[in-house]
Structure formats: structure tokens, C-alpha cells
Amino acid sequence: RRTVKSAPQ
């Protein structure tokens, strides 16, 4: 997959 920005935890 392409890199996706994860939501800040």
C-alpha cells in the first residue's frame, strides 16, 4: 500500500 498519514493517537 501507499503510505497514509495515520491519525495521531
Curated annotation (Swiss-Prot):
One GO-annotated biological process of the protein: photosynthesis
Entry GO terms, CC: chloroplast thylakoid membrane; photosystem I; photosystem II
Listed transmembrane segments: none
Organism in which the protein naturally occurs: Spinacia oleracea
Cofactor note: Binds at least 14 chlorophylls (8 Chl-a and 6 Chl-b) and carotenoids such as lutein and neoxanthin.
Protein name: Chlorophyll a-b binding protein
Record PTM text: Photoregulated by reversible phosphorylation of its threonine residues.
Keyword Thylakoid (UniProt): yes
Domain of life, source organism: Eukaryota
Domain description: The N-terminus of the protein extends into the stroma where it is involved with adhesion of granal membranes and post-translational modifications; both are believed to mediate the distribution of excitation energy between photosystems I and II.
Family the entry assigns: Belongs to the light-harvesting chlorophyll a/b-binding (LHC) protein family.
Modified sites of kind N2-acetylarginine: R1
Assembly, per entry: The LHC complex consists of chlorophyll a-b binding proteins.
Keywords: Acetylation, Chlorophyll, Chloroplast, Chromophore, Magnesium, Membrane, Metal-binding, Phosphoprotein, Photosynthesis, Photosystem I, Photosystem II, Plastid, Thylakoid
GO molecular function, one term: metal ion binding
Record's bilayer topology term: Multi-pass membrane protein
Function: The light-harvesting complex (LHC) functions as a light receptor, it captures and delivers excitation energy to photosystems with which it is closely associated.
Cell location: Plastid, Chloroplast thylakoid membrane
Record keyword Plastid present: yes
PTM sites of type Phosphothreonine: T3
